[in-house]
Swiss-Prot record:
Belongs to the cytochrome c oxidase subunit 2 family. The keyword Metal-binding applies. InterPro entries: CcO_II, CcO_II-like_C, CcO_II_C, Copper_CuA, Cupredoxin, Cyt_c_oxidase_su2, Cyt_c_oxidase_su2_TM_dom, Cyt_c_oxidase_su2_TM_sf. The gene is MT-CO2. One of its GO terms (biological process) is ATP synthesis coupled electron transport. Mg(2+) binds at E198. The lineage of its organism: Eukaryota, Metazoa, Chordata, Craniata, Vertebrata. GO terms for cellular component: mitochondrial inner membrane; respiratory chain complex IV. One of its GO terms (molecular function) is copper ion binding. It catalyses: 4 Fe(II)-[cytochrome c] + O2 + 8 H(+)(in) = 4 Fe(III)-[cytochrome c] + 2 H2O + 4 H(+)(out). This is Cytochrome c oxidase subunit 2. It is found in: Mitochondrion inner membrane. Component of the cytochrome c oxidase, the last enzyme in the mitochondrial electron transport chain which drives oxidative phosphorylation. The respiratory chain contains 3 multisubunit complexes succinate dehydrogenase (complex II, CII), ubiquinol-cytochrome c oxidoreductase (cytochrome b-c1 complex, complex III, CIII) and cytochrome c oxidase (complex IV, CIV), that cooperate to transfer electrons derived from NADH and succinate to molecular oxygen, creating an electrochemical gradient over the inner membrane that drives transmembrane transport and the ATP synthase. Gene3D superfamilies: 1.10.287.90, Cupredoxins - blue copper proteins (2.60.40.420).
Length: 227
């Protein structure tokens, strides 16, 4: 989860988020090199008295500043497209969970189980126990097995919402009348927090998401107790 004064991303907990962090570092390096080059050229222009007022044509320079940006864009686009295809790929999910957004709470349905569904509301600040997080705790957590591919089907009952878990690299819009899907795989157990990431009304800030990733055996025990 995020901490006060945090400068970087949250710790990656899924293969997709690991790829996104690598892509961020790759792109940031390219941006840093371009910015350094531009600042260097500007500093030279400000400190030298030499000018080329008689230059009418420079084919070599025009060729360089046409080809070089094209190469840079390709270096950014190729890894980006690779990650996009990885995020859309869903191979034989072990579990499917249907998520519906409401004003202002989430409801979940485990489609592989009969009558396993519940609503998830934010716990008011006045009801929090010591150590619990303000505006992030819910009365019913989404319990999922770790290290298994899980498909999330996401939609909305009323207005636009967005289901987002930053540490898993997930953000999928919940659109009325449309069923979007995303896949997640957690590499380690724990609690993972998210929030609605689409302004949806006066209580938009009060729609937290809490995933509890546990070993498969613990998940089976939990699902049996819920039925």
């Amino acid at each position: 989860m995020a901490y006060p004064f945090e400068l970087g991303f949250q710790d990656a907990t899924s293969p997709i988020m690991e790829e996104l962090l690598h892509f961020h570092d790759h792109t940031l390096m390219i941006v840093f090199l371009i910015s350094s080059l531009v600042l260097y050229i500007i500093s030279l222009m400000l400190t030298t008295k030499l000018t080329h007022t008689s230059t009418m044509d420079a084919q070599e320079v025009e060729t360089i500043w046409t080809i070089l940006p094209a190469i840079i864009l390709i270096l950014i686009a190729l890894p980006s497209l690779r990650i996009l295809y990885m995020m859309d790929e869903i191979n034989d999910p072990s579990l499917t969970v249907k998520t519906m957004g409401h004003q202002w709470y989430w409801s979940y349905e485990y489609t592989d189980y009969e009558d396993l569904n519940f609503d998830s509301y934010m716990i008011p600040t006045s009801d929090l126990s010591p150590g619990e997080l303000r505006l992030l705790e819910v009365d019913n957590r989404v319990v999922l097995p770790m290290e298994l591919p899980i498909r999330m089907l996401i939609s909305s009952e009323d207005v636009l919402h967005s289901w987002a878990i930053p540490s898993l690299g997930l953000k999928t819009d919940a659109i009325p009348g449309r069923l979007n899907q995303a896949t997640l795989t957690s590499t380690r157990p724990g609690l993972y927090y998210g929030q609605c990431s689409e302004i949806c009304g006066s209580n938009h800030s009060f729609m937290p998401i809490v995933l509890e990733l546990v070993p498969l055996k613990h998940f089976e025990n939990w699902s049996s107790s819920m039925l």
